[in-house]
Amino acid sequence: MHVVLAGGGTAGHIEPALALADALRRQDPTVGITALGTERGLETRLVPERGYELALIPAVPLPRKPTPELITVPGRLRGTIKATEQILERTKADAVAGFGGYVALPAYLAAKRLGVPIVVHEANARPGLANKIGSRYAAQVAVSTPDSKLRNSRYIGIPLRRSIATLDRAAARPEARAMFGLDPNLPTLLVTGGSQGARRLNEVIQQVAPWLQQAGIQILHAVGPKNELPQVHQMPGMPPYIPVSYLDRMDLAYAAADMMLCRAGAMTVAELSAVGLPAAYVPLPIGNGEQRLNAQPVVKAGGGLLVDDAELTPEWLQQNVLPVLADPHRLYEMSRAAAEFGRRDADDLLVGMVYEAIAARARR
């Protein structure tokens, strides 16, 4: 059996695809896996690092809104579809599993032409254009939110890395806090804006850090590799404020934390919900508003807080986040609510949907 994955561009598309690849290999070590990508996407690094074949196709960005560039898309797309067809034929693909992004649409159209079963996974609450089109031709459609608008979809959550999906935060906490140089007993706030960091979150947390420390809160802050580390003048006897450029072990960062301040990308929301880590979500104020929609269900369930980017101030953190971190019972209740909302088994469920799609084709 050979499965072709189509989910390049950003980590939000690539990580669920790789989680599916890992789950397929756990069930059948002989399964062939090829990931489609473009030469400018993160997949050029992430896919080979995980040991999977990467096949490059020309990038055809899809404008979010009608623009003059939209006229050129069909012509450029034809060449990319042809290149994708050649990969599907070379690998003798039994299924295409798509996750959105630049490479997904040509993969769906090439698979439709060749009669290869399509499985679509949509991570965002508001589907992107590629997955809207792909879902029309798909044998199986999986979504990450219960109220998705994609037709004939099945709610499974988002496939996660095993280090996250199997994480026992309480058991890993002593190791995690020791690794980051944190106090083993103090309430801990984790702050990160994702792989690239978030300037506004960085600015606000640096302003409010002294107040949090005075209240007995320690902070682990990933500023992002493109941002300068702040100068820290640690006062004797004060809880630590530890800025780092990047967190290689997000599982241990989650284990070390009691609460998180972060953006609301679909993968972030899924991971925090799965491990039961409550968060103050600050949706990125661009795009089509999908980050707010991503966070709303878990916030409604009681597993987090939600604040607009423009409303995030030191005063808001003092009034809303500090009381949570200072109240162990409230932290426990929010953690439980997040965990009850989260899904840890989406990777295995999606494997089942891939097998169902292949079996349905065989019966025809």
Curated annotation (Swiss-Prot):
Its EC number(s): 2.4.1.227
Tagged with keyword Methyltransferase: no
Membrane topology, as annotated: Peripheral membrane protein
Annotated catalysed reactions: di-trans,octa-cis-undecaprenyl diphospho-N-acetyl-alpha-D-muramoyl-L-alanyl-D-glutamyl-meso-2,6-diaminopimeloyl-D-alanyl-D-alanine + UDP-N-acetyl-alpha-D-glucosamine = di-trans,octa-cis-undecaprenyl diphospho-[N-acetyl-alpha-D-glucosaminyl-(1->4)]-N-acetyl-alpha-D-muramoyl-L-alanyl-D-glutamyl-meso-2,6-diaminopimeloyl-D-alanyl-D-alanine + UDP + H(+)
Subcellular location: Cell membrane
This protein's pathway: Cell wall biogenesis; peptidoglycan biosynthesis
GO cellular component, one term: plasma membrane
Keyword Transferase carried by entry: yes
Keyword tags: Cell cycle, Cell division, Cell membrane, Cell shape, Cell wall biogenesis/degradation, Glycosyltransferase, Membrane, Peptidoglycan synthesis, Transferase
Residues noted as binding UDP-N-acetyl-alpha-D-glucosamine in the record, renumbered to the chain: 10-12, 124, 161, 195, 291
SUPFAM superfamilies attached to this UniProt entry: UDP-Glycosyltransferase/glycogen phosphorylase
Pfam families with a match to the protein in the record: Glyco_tran_28_C, Glyco_transf_28
Leading EC class: transferase
PANTHER family to which the protein is assigned, alphabetical: GLYCOSYLTRANSFERASE, UDP-N-ACETYLGLUCOSAMINE--N-ACETYLMURAMYL-(PENTAPEPTIDE) PYROPHOSPHORYL-UNDECAPRENOL N-ACETYLGLUCOSAMINE TRANSFERASE 1
Described purpose of this protein according to its UniProt entry: Cell wall formation. Catalyzes the transfer of a GlcNAc subunit on undecaprenyl-pyrophosphoryl-MurNAc-pentapeptide (lipid intermediate I) to form undecaprenyl-pyrophosphoryl-MurNAc-(pentapeptide)GlcNAc (lipid intermediate II).
Similarity comment: family membership: Belongs to the glycosyltransferase 28 family. MurG subfamily.
Name recorded for this polypeptide: UDP-N-acetylglucosamine--N-acetylmuramyl-(pentapeptide) pyrophosphoryl-undecaprenol N-acetylglucosamine transferase
